[in-house]
């Protein structure tokens, strides 16, 4: 069977840049599924994406499905015919479904009986006939949160569609996709190359688009070119470009023919905190800032034009004129804000609502101030500095700079605090209170900052759970999942001596009578333990290891982490599987018994050598391991407990627990309970698979 290259290009108006990659990848994934479901042999499915097009190119696509033999078994003969030999309704219905009459059916005989059988040779459909529906289905399944409708048609897509190119080899596949009749026409760059041209063969793509249309269709190629050219441009002016992955992706999604240029701004603007300038350049203008080797911002920026100009200086000057007013605004706001102290913004916090039932930002500030001081006392941080940081924590939200450039919250608080002469760890805490902002983000760097960051997040968790507005499904408007994971990361990775129970209780207490959820403390802790589950799964821990630790509900995050590492190590020991099974057996035996057990094992009642040996080792280990448990040395404790494998195995091989002698039975049950309690001091290893 011959093979050909298939090309589908959907020509659109400008697609959302932040969604371009996901749209293209999903298109390719969806179409691959369609090909496989149809049984069409194919080679690589390659995707291309540019601002005004989504394209797939499929190599070595079979021209038709393979022929196949099908068999459909019908009713058993006993049910297929009545006593007179006439076909039953079941047999007739089955035959209609197969497109035959009952008398045309074959018979299938096995050692289990005889059935009606339909056999047929099905000729594979041509690829040409299948492709239109496969393309339409793949497009319909794209992850588009908001569809558009254009013109008078009822067609919906992410953006209006102007061209649809469907080529199998050199042949146009006739179809109407998204309201457009397929053709071999492709549109080029808006301002360079040929605005529109025809493509003779699918194999010509994407080279023909580059040569005639001045469009680089390959997304990764454009991105790599921007990165390489920007690095070279920065090197020429003695700096390093800030090429963040997210901005690189966005810029690559905005241009069809990237041309990297370098521009500058007045050095006087460098007196403004670099973060504000960078926010303007990256967030508003999609420029790449440039830093000197010492990390200081240079008065230059790199940008990407979407056209090759005969006079690039004109484009450079235009971009410099665009950014200058924004930088001047930042300079004005910075100078204006510094005319008063950061603390002077406190009264204005009373005018901004945090949440209707939970009060204003000033109310939140007062709670954070108190909670940060309490946390500082627990972890050995400077209490005065922590409470001061709490008091100032939201003041920068009332400044002109943060009002205009919202992403500078925190960092501007730090700069204004330094200007006011606040302690350095207080100033740093104002900047780091929102960390970690995302997975893998840096944690607060000093104890005061840790106290403030935890206080801010715990206040939000306690308040929102306290009024019953916990996250539901994918909806998490107050970012509580991120807040909970942030608290856990800070406590675990900084090894802070904090207990979620007392921490949550203190956060709840500071709300007074504002909260309506009587179970708020337990709800917050359960939610945070659930975040632990997600965190450790992402770290590669098995679900049963996590369950074993969660069963003990440890509320000290650092302690939880130590238990996780201990159980994970325990699983590598030779004795682990046997002891996990033994614990499960012990758990089941104890669960089935409703008898009241003694506080201690009566050694004089023991009879069998195996139970005597096990009882002695349990007593010895109980005393030996007490310091281990007190110090959180759970891994060492489980290594010691692994030595119980042989006596435990011997006990269950030789000793009957549920004997008729009540005293003996209760004594043996008590011994098993004491054995299980030793393991439960770390985790419920009976849950290990």
From Swiss-Prot:
The gene is glyS. One of its GO terms (biological process) is glycyl-tRNA aminoacylation. It is found in: Cytoplasm. This is Glycine--tRNA ligase beta subunit. GO terms for cellular component: cytosol. It is an enzyme of class 6 (ligase). It comes from the Bacteria. NCBIfam families: glyS (TIGR00211). Its EC number is 6.1.1.14. InterPro entries: DALR_anticod-bd (IPR008909), Gly-tRNA-synth_bsu (IPR015944), Gly-tRNA-synth_heterodimer (IPR006194). Its main location: cytoplasm. Tetramer of two alpha and two beta subunits. GO terms for molecular function: arginine-tRNA ligase activity; ATP binding; glycine-tRNA ligase activity. Keywords: Aminoacyl-tRNA synthetase, ATP-binding, Cytoplasm, Ligase, Nucleotide-binding, Protein biosynthesis. Belongs to the class-II aminoacyl-tRNA synthetase family. PANTHER family: GLYCINE--TRNA LIGASE, CHLOROPLASTIC_MITOCHONDRIAL 2, GLYCYL-TRNA SYNTHETASE. It catalyses: tRNA(Gly) + glycine + ATP = glycyl-tRNA(Gly) + AMP + diphosphate.
């Amino acid at each position: 069977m011959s093979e050909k290259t298939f090309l589908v290009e959907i020509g659109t108006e400008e697609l959302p840049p932040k969604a371009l990659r996901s749209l293209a990848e999903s298109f390719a994934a969806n179409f691959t599924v369609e090909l496989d479901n149809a049984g069409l042999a194919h080679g690589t499915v390659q995707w291309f994406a540019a601002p005004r097009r989504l394209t797939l190119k499929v190599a070595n696509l079979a021209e038709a499905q393979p022929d196949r033999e099908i068999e459909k078994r019908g009713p058993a003969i006993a049910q297929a015919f009545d006593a007179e030999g006439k076909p039953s309704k079941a047999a007739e219905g089955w035959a209609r479904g197969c497109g035959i009459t009952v008398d045309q059916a074959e018979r299938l005989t096995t050692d289990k009986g005889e059935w009606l059988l339909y056999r047929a040779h099905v000729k594979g459909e041509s690829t040409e006939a299948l492709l239109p529906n496969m393309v339409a289905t793949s497009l319909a399944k794209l992850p588009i949160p908001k569809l558009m409708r254009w013109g008078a048609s009822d067609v919906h897509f992410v953006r209006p569609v102007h061209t649809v190119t469907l080529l199998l080899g050199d042949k146009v596949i006739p179809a109407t996709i998204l309201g457009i009749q397929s053709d071999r026409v492709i549109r080029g760059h808006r301002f360079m190359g040929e605005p529109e041209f025809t493509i003779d063969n699918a194999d010509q793509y994407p080279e023909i688009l580059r040569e005639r249309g001045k469009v680089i269709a390959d997304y990764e190629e454009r991105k790599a070119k921007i990165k390489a050219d920007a690095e070279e441009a920065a090197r020429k002016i003695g700096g390093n470009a800030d090429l963040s992955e997210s901005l690189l992706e966005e810029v690559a999604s905005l241009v069809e023919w990237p041309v990297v240029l370098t521009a500058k701004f007045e050095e006087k603007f460098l007196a403004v905190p670099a973060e504000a300038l960078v926010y303007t350049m990256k967030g508003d203008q999609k420029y790449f800032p440039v830093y000197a080797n010492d990390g200081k911002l240079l008065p230059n920026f790199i940008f990407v034009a979407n056209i090759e100009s005969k006079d690039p200086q004109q484009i450079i000057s235009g971009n410099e004129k665009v950014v200058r007013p924004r930088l001047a605004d930042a300079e004005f706001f910075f100078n204006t804000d510094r005319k008063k102290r950061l603390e002077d913004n406190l009264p204005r916090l009373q005018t901004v609502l945090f949440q209707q039932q939970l009060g204003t930002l000033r109310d939140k500030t007062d709670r954070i101030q108190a909670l940060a001081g309490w946390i500082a006392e627990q972890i050995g941080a400077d209490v005065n500095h922590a409470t001061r940081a709490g008091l100032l924590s939201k003041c920068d939200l009332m400044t002109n700079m943060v009002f205009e450039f919202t992403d500078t919250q925190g960092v501007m608080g730090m700069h204004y605090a330094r200007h006011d002469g606040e302690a350095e760890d207080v100033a740093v805490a104002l900047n780091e209170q929102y960390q970690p902002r995302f997975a893998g983000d840096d944690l607060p760097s000093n104890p005061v900052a840790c106290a403030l960051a935890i206080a801010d997040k715990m206040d939000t968790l306690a308040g929102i759970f306290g009024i019953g507005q916990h996250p539901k499904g994918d909806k998490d408007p107050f970012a509580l999942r991120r807040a909970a994971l942030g608290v856990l990361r800070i406590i675990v990775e900084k090894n802070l001596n904090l207990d979620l129970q007392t921490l949550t209780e203190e956060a709840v207490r500071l709300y007074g009578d504002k909260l309506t959820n009587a179970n708020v403390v337990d709800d917050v802790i359960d939610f945070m333990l659930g975040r632990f589950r997600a965190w450790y799964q992402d770290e590669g821990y098995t679900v049963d290891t996590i369950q074993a630790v969660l069963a003990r509900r440890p509320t000290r995050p650092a302690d939880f982490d130590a238990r996780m590492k201990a159980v994970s190590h325990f699983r590598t020991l030779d004795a682990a599987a046997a002891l996990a099974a033994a614990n499960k057996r012990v758990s089941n035996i104890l669960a089935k018994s409703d008898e009241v057990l003694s506080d201690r094992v009566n050694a004089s009642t023991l009879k069998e050598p195996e139970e005597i040996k096990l009882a002695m080792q349990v007593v010895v280990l109980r005393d030996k391991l007490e310091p281990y448990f007190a110090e959180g040395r759970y891994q060492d404790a489980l290594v010691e407990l692994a030595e119980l494998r042989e006596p435990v195995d011997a006990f269950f091989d030789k000793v009957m627990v549920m004997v008729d002698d009540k005293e003996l039975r209760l004594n043996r049950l008590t011994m098993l309970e004491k054995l299980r309690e030793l393991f439960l001091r770390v985790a419920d290893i009976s849950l290990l698979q």
